[in-house]
């Protein structure tokens, strides 16, 4: 039963690694069209698209990011069809804010590249996979459970970041240019440091 002190919200600054994934995507496009398969036009998703696009533009100012809305968090058919529509328009990189691997599978079948989401999904479309903004909820859950069992949990709002490890970037594909990998590492450290 909620009593005002035993309830809290936890979420993360996923826009931080999304920016970095945009840098990788910007380096990988030859057509300068990147398709972004997104669930719903809500602040979390729009924030991620904006961060991704800024990362793309840091590396490749000529590249464009075009969004297709699916109106679902998980529907592999809709996600795959949406990715295919972008590929048919000439996109050679597909990014996503979805929960299945369908966009990546379509990208791989077309010989395109893919920025996944949620976890390292490289095993699902290894030839297409570039990287992914990822979550690591384990330490946060352990912290909250530890506080709750010790009777010290105070609730409140937790807004995790790359600095505390709640969000991060999956390993970058080995064929991404070393200068881009170095630029991403430098920008990541700046984000963590707040500089």
Question: Which ranges hold each PLM region?
Answer:
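A residue-level marker of the well-folded mature domains of exported/periplasmic proteins
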Residues: 1-195
